[in-house]
């Protein structure tokens, strides 16, 4: 299970969807296809896959990217799906009325989906290497400036 306290909160954001009304097995089939891919590639894959589980996962990925850009100031082009997991939720139990006063149980499975996005431009080893050779300056606030051989790149 993904811990609530993350190892690197400066480069990771997450979105959590609870009590989504579908089987965890069916959601895992889609999650396994997007784990480790970039944000833009994930959106294209989810739009083209013909499964019902794609829509809630699409909304969660989109929400996690909105959290990254609004709360942390990350660029969406630099985000990758670092962790994605599906856990089983509580089963909703209902009764379906049948003939002659009988009833059949209906079990509606639910699941909890967690999507964690990571900003690869701020990876620690990459940042240390860039700072060591003077390629990046980090301001106290969210603006970051990089420079290359020919000038300053924002």
UniProtKB/Swiss-Prot annotation:
Pfam families xrefs: Ribosomal_L22 (PF00237)
One Gene Ontology biological process: translation
GO molecular function terms listed in the Swiss-Prot or TrEMBL record: rRNA binding; structural constituent of ribosome
Keywords (A to Z) from UniProt: Chloroplast, Plastid, Ribonucleoprotein, Ribosomal protein, RNA-binding, rRNA-binding
Primary residence: plastid
InterPro entries: Ribosomal_uL22, Ribosomal_uL22_bac/chlpt-type, Ribosomal_uL22_bac/org-type, Ribosomal_uL22_CS, Ribosomal_uL22_sf
GO CC terms: chloroplast; large ribosomal subunit
PROSITE patterns: RIBOSOMAL_L22 (PS00464)
Subcellular location(s) per record: Plastid, Chloroplast
Subunit structure: Part of the 50S ribosomal subunit.
Record-linked HAMAP family: Ribosomal_uL22_B
Family per record: Belongs to the universal ribosomal protein uL22 family.
NCBIfam families named in the record: rplV_bact
Free-text function comment from the UniProt entry: This protein binds specifically to 23S rRNA.
Name of protein: Large ribosomal subunit protein uL22c
């Amino acid at each position: 299970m993904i811990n609530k306290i993350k190892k690197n909160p400066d480069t990771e954001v997450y979105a959590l969807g609870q009590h989504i009304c579908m089987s965890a097995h069916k959601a895992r089939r889609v999650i396994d296809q997007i784990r480790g891919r970039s944000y833009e590639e994930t959106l294209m894959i989810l739009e083209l896959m013909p499964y019902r589980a794609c829509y809630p996962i699409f909304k969660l990925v989109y929400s996690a990217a909105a959290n990254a850009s609004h709360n942390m100031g990350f660029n969406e082009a630099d985000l990758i799906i670092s962790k994605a997991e599906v856990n089983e939720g509580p089963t909703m139990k209902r009764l379906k009325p049948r003939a002659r006063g009988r009833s059949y149980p209906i079990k509606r499975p639910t699941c909890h989906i967690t999507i964690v996005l990571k900003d690869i431009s701020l990876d620690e080893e990459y940042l240390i290497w860039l700072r060591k050779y003077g390629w990046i300056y980090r301001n106290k606030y969210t603006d970051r400036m990089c420079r290359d051989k020919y000038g300053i790149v924002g």
